[in-house]
Amino acid sequence: MALKTLSAKAAAALDRELMSTGAFSIDQLMELAGLSVSQAVARVHPTKQGRRVLVAVGPGNNGGDGLVAARHLFHYGYQPAIYYPKRPKNDLYQRLVKQCEDLEIPFVDDFFAALESTDHVVDAIFGFSFSGEVREPFPAVINAMAETKVPVTSVDAPSSWDINEGPPKSGVGSNFHPNVLVSLTAPKPLVKYFKGRHFVGGRFVAPSIAKKYDFDVPKYEGIDQIVEITDNQVKI
């Protein structure tokens, strides 16, 4: 099966439809997305390779997915730590933080010190809707993820990448190439620039909605929330 990519406009419209005619709440979608990310991390980095996972969390929904993933990783036996410098005030994110705090998952202020003592990084800073300039404190964080030898898993899009054009031509993120990408719902056009292990996650789309947005839902096996795909399985 050749999986079609979703543009930023189509992906945003799909999210709105899932929360209207699809009858999902944003909490449900974030929970299922974060669960997918946690399964991908467990697949590529089993605990025997190191339990410490640093989750870099941004201020939007991508960051929410990261908080959910951190919680699930804790329950799998990992030792997550969360870097969350820009916290929204709304109730959804505050509840996600509380859930992690109740598990005594540490929130760290110094990303760079935490990076020196972790086994894996989850990049949940910016997602498919990112555009414009990377603002503080994230430029140095993205550059550090680009330079580290620690494996990095990005959520839906490598942070700073344009959804269509991939990595910036220069500046922040121009040399950021994570090891793993988890595309949520469907791949985005930027995957043509990505060379690592690629998963699709988000096992919640009804066939009628997939047909309307002209993309294929991959075949998930058993109880898996992710499917690993190869370059020749994506239609740009």
UniProtKB/Swiss-Prot annotation:
UniProt xrefs under InterPro entries: YjeF_N_dom, YjeF_N_dom_sf, YJEFN_prot_NAXE-like
Coiled-coil region(s): none
Enzyme Commission (EC) number: 5.1.99.6
Pfam families referenced in this protein's UniProt entry, alphabetically: YjeF_N (PF03853)
Reaction catalyzed: (6R)-NADHX = (6S)-NADHX; (6R)-NADPHX = (6S)-NADPHX
Cofactor note: Binds 1 potassium ion per subunit.
Chain sites annotated for binding (6S)-NADPHX: N61, N62, G63, G64, D65, G127, F128, S129, F130, S131, G132, E133, D156
The protein's required cofactors: K(+)
Keywords assigned: Cytoplasm, Isomerase, Metal-binding, Mitochondrion, NAD, NADP, Nucleotide-binding, Potassium
Compartment annotation: Cytoplasm; Mitochondrion
Record flagged with keyword tRNA-binding: no
Binding site for K(+): N62, D123, S159
GO CC field: mitochondrion
YjeF N-terminal domain mapped to chain residues: 11-217
GO molecular function terms attached to this record: metal ion binding; NAD(P)HX epimerase activity; nucleotide binding
Main localization category: cytoplasm
UniProt family annotation: Belongs to the NnrE/AIBP family.
Free-text function comment from the UniProt entry: Catalyzes the epimerization of the S- and R-forms of NAD(P)HX, a damaged form of NAD(P)H that is a result of enzymatic or heat-dependent hydration. This is a prerequisite for the S-specific NAD(P)H-hydrate dehydratase to allow the repair of both epimers of NAD(P)HX.
Protein name: NAD(P)H-hydrate epimerase
Organism name: Neurospora crassa (strain ATCC 24698 / 74-OR23-1A / CBS 708.71 / DSM 1257 / FGSC 987)
Lineage of producing organism: Eukaryota, Fungi, Dikarya, Ascomycota, Pezizomycotina
